[in-house]
Amino acid sequence: MRIRIEKAKRRLSLWQGRQCLYRCPVQLGRCPVGPKRREGDGRTPEGAYRVCSRNPRSKFYRALGISYPAEPDARAAFREGRIDRDALRQIESAVRKRVRPPWDTPLGGWIMIHGQPSDGRPVARDWTAGCVAVSDADMAWLFAHVAQGTRVIIRP
């Protein structure tokens, strides 16, 4: 099973082999074009990740944590001097162990697929800090059907 998020189409789909099991609209980070490069840039990452955590009591209804940053994100950042060797090694180790990578590096973290704000406030089209938001009804379905470790592909 895998989740595919197409940023330009604002769409999430859940696939089992060649069969699409579920599809829903998404809202992205407040700066939706381009890959995430650093903490606070408001961008949603692009690349291959995994669901690395599940939160049934998120302040955004429910949440599935995404394993950003992944090795390609970390290697590019190291080459460009945006993270040090220690941060690179920590991220590589987490990826090998299939656990949550460190979310406190200069690359940012805490990227989730989640529901809507619990305070009921209206939100803009793309309003998150870099996460992927769906309706609470869509999040309930996804949370019931998506296991930890599921692949997540985020495309431009």
Where are these regions (language model features)?
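N-terminal post-signal-peptidase region of extra-cytosolic proteins
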Residues: M1-R2, A8, L28-S53, R98, ...
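Residue-level signal for tight coil/turn positions that link beta-strands
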Residues: K7-K9, G108
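Core beta-strand residues in small-molecule sensory/regulatory alpha/beta domains
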Residues: S13-W15
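Short Gly/aromatic-enriched secondary-structure transition segments
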Residues: Q19-C31
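A short, polar/proline- and glycine-enriched secondary-structure boundary/capping micro-motif
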Residues: C24-P25, G34, A74-A76
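Exported/periplasmic cell-wall-interacting domains
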Residues: S53-P156
